[in-house]
Amino acid sequence: MAELKMRSSRVLRKLRAGEVVCMAKLNTADARVAEIAAQAGFDCLWACLEHVPNSIEVIERQIMVGKAYDVDTMVRVSRGGYSDYIRPLEMDAAGIMVPHIMSLKDAKWVVRTTRFHPIGRRPVDGGNADGAYCGIEFNEYLRQANEQRFIGIQIEDPEPLDELEEIVALEGIDMIFFGPGDFSQSIGAPGQWDHPLIDQTRRRVAELCRKHGKCAATPGSPDNLQSLIDMGYTALNMCADVVGLFQYFNGIAADIRKVIPDFGKETAAGGMYGKLR
C-alpha cells in the first residue's frame, strides 16, 4: 500500500510562495453551494461555527467538498473548550480561526491546544480524516499536522492591542485576521469604517505580520483588493454566499417590477422583516 500522508494545505502553499489567498465565506448549510465556490477557483472556503447555526456534520460535508477540488476549508470555531478547536482539524479542515482573542495569554492557550509537540500539547487521536484513519504513523501525524495545518486568530477588540506584537510573533499562529465589524462597535464607533483607530489597527496588523512573517487577513472586495494587498494583506475574504444570493434574487425581482410593478407586494407587506422596499 502506498504511504499515506496528510493533505497539504493550499493556503499555506500559496502563502509560503508569496502569493495572495482569496476566500469565500459560507453561511448556508448546502454542500452544493460550497462546491460552486470551490469550482469558481477560491483558495479557501470559510465555514463558521461561531455565528452560523450549522451542525458539525454540515461542516464535515463542506470540508469534503473542498478537498475534492484541492480547496482548503477554514472553520471559525466557537469559543469553548479545546474540543471545539480540534474537532474541525480532525475532520481535516486545513485551518481554524479563533474569534475575539483578548490577550497574549488567550493566544498562548490557543497554541497550546491546537499544536502538537514540541509547539503545544494538542490532544492526540489520529483515527480521523486528518490522520487517514490511523493510516499515518504517530510521529509523522504530529509533524505533518504542525506543518500542514494553519491556526488563525481574530483581532476584533481593543483589549489585545497593547500586546499585539507579542501575539503576532507567537510561534504556532499563522494568520492574524483583523475584523473591522466587531472592532468598530467595540471602540464605540459602529460602522464608521473611516474611524482613525480602525485604519490605524488595520495598518498595524499588516505591518506586524510582515515583520514577523505571518499572514495578515481581513475582509475585502474587488474594489479595495489591490489597496489591501499593497498594505500587506495576504489573505482576503472576498464574498459570502448569502450576500450573493440576496443580491441575485433582489436584482431579478427589481427587473420583474419594471414589467409587473406590484410584484412582491404581498411579501413586502406581510414578511417577518416588514416592508423591505
Ranges and model annotations:
Residues M1-N27, G135-E147, R203-K211, A268, ...:
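N-terminal amphipathic alpha-helix/helix-capping segment at the start of soluble metabolic enzymes
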Residues A2, S9, D241-G244, Y248-R277:
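Extended, intrinsically disordered, low-complexity segments
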Residues C22-L26, L45-A47, T73-V77, I96-V98, ...:
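Hydrophobic faces of well-ordered beta-strands that scaffold small-molecule active sites
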Residues S83, G95-E171, K265-R277:
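Conserved anion-binding
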Residues G95-W109, I176-Q185, T234-I252:
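Glycine-rich phosphate-binding active-site loops on the catalytic face of alpha/beta enzymes
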Residues E35, Q39, V75, G80-A94, ...:
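Catalytic cores of alpha/beta
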Residues R10, S55-E90, R112-G120, R143-E147, ...:
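Alpha-helix-loop-beta-strand connector modules within alpha/beta enzyme cores
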